[in-house]
Amino acid sequence: MSIQTQEAHDMSLKSLSLIATHSHIVGLGLDENLQPKPSSQGMVGQLQARRAAGVILKMVQNGTIAGRAVLVAGPPSTGKTALAMGLSQSLGADVPFTAMAGSEIFSLELSKTEALTQAFRKSIGVKIKEDTELIEGEVVEIQIDRSITGGHKQGKLTIKTTDMETIYELGNKMIDGLTKEKVLAGDVISIDKACGKITKLGRSFARSRDYDAMGPDTKFVQCPEGELQKRKSVVHTVSLHEIDVINSRTQGFLALFTGDTGEIRSEVRDQINTKVAEWKEEGKAEIVPGVLFIDEVHMLDIECFSFINRALEDEFAPIVIMATNRGISKTRGTNYKSPHGLPLDLLDRSIIITTQNYSEQEIKTILSIRSQEEEVELTEDALDLLTKIGGETSLRYSSNLIAVSQQIAQKRKSSSVDVQDVKRAYLLFLDSTRSAKYLQEYESRYIDDHGRVDISTTGRNADAMDTNE
């Protein structure tokens, strides 16, 4: 079987920068000795958990250990997802990191095991080394002869380095490529001999005085030295899932962009595993074990946990990091209770990292970082009030009040958020504790699980209206 690999192009909008919940986190905030700093790279507090995550980080970077399960357990609003996001940022772009929620695998289009298999294989990278022949030089002259009848075009390309000069015959494809890239005499270009791809490297310094005015994107480079034809080693990094999709159907690479991958047959994956193992032995490829992060892992059922147990023992297995805020609770699909809602055999395979509640000073530091990220100017008194609210309710609720308070402050034409803005936002939007208290007080006015509601208490006056004339 001939395995095809193509680099997946990121089609996301790079210029679109939105402020998300964890957009202020750029790393784990560790020094060179893996010791956590009190506040660094957007991470605050949780020193023991961050130190443990630093050890996991080194395990992944070394690439020698895979197939390990890590459970991050702690109460709500203690930074479990933030810890995983910090780990993702510290790993960089070369190490695959796949994040998903526990409920994402339940789909009508894919089975649970297929969704988990795809997530596992997205987290395993393959670095494929390829030697390519390139022609690099400065364009001296381009001659293109076009037929009057609109037939085949012919042309000649004169290209040089500081040591030699050569003339190449051009066909239709190369002429179209040069026209598309708008290559002119004096440009320094690179041509891939295998596929005919033309890359414009810049403009030669010798032609810097040809024009009086040039665009801001014009880049001047030196004329290449030595031979025109050079061998260059290129490393392509793709995931096993991308190779699966490309080889699963005739136009499989299109599914990388549409997301319509469907069920991939196990025979295809087995052949790809065999081929990748051959490439690894021959030195053509290198396996990069990545990280699979499953948030709200207690939402998985017993069949999924059984699959994860088996998948962790596979040859191509990433490090699986799971997060949960459950205590002693039922495992989905069973009638028995277990710690964190996970079966005991998976807990036995996992190393567990615990997170603690934030202190008042740590909450204040986090809210200060969030206000800077959202470009909201808070007065010292407003920050103290938000810190107090965060300690009594939750950190999420307090951080959500920042943007709301800014809108209230803008309404009164103020550039900074004051205490009165925070108080008004606090009164307008209830937290979970006040909402639960309100429900208990007016429970009879709400519809219960059986569809019943006490109609006699829904109005302000419980007395019946007199309709007699």
UniProtKB/Swiss-Prot annotation:
PANTHER family associated with the record: RUVB-RELATED REPTIN AND PONTIN (PTHR11093)
Localisation: Nucleus
Known EC number: 3.6.4.12
Entry keyword Membrane: no
Pfam families: TIP49 (PF06068), TIP49_C (PF17856)
GO cellular component assignments: Ino80 complex; NuA4 histone acetyltransferase complex; R2TP complex; Swr1 complex
GO MF, any single term: 3'-5' DNA helicase activity
Catalytic reaction(s) noted: ATP + H2O = ADP + phosphate + H(+)
The protein's role, per its UniProt record: DNA helicase which participates in several chromatin remodeling complexes, including the SWR1 and the INO80 complexes. The SWR1 complex mediates the ATP-dependent exchange of histone H2A for the H2A variant HZT1 leading to transcriptional regulation of selected genes by chromatin remodeling. The INO80 complex remodels chromatin by shifting nucleosomes and is involved in DNA repair. Also involved in pre-rRNA processing.
Location (main, coarse): nucleus
One biological process term in Gene Ontology: box C/D snoRNP assembly
Chain sites annotated for binding ATP: 74-81
Protein family per UniProt: Belongs to the RuvB family.
Protein's name in the database: RuvB-like helicase 2
Gene3D superfamilies: 1.10.8.60, P-loop containing nucleotide triphosphate hydrolases (3.40.50.300), RuvB-like helicase, domain II (2.40.50.360)
Alphabetically ordered keywords of this record: Activator, ATP-binding, Chromatin regulator, DNA damage, DNA repair, Helicase, Hydrolase, Nucleotide-binding, Nucleus, rRNA processing, Transcription, Transcription regulation
Subunit structure: May form heterododecamers with RVB1. Component of the SWR1 chromatin remodeling complex, the INO80 chromatin remodeling complex, and of the R2TP complex.
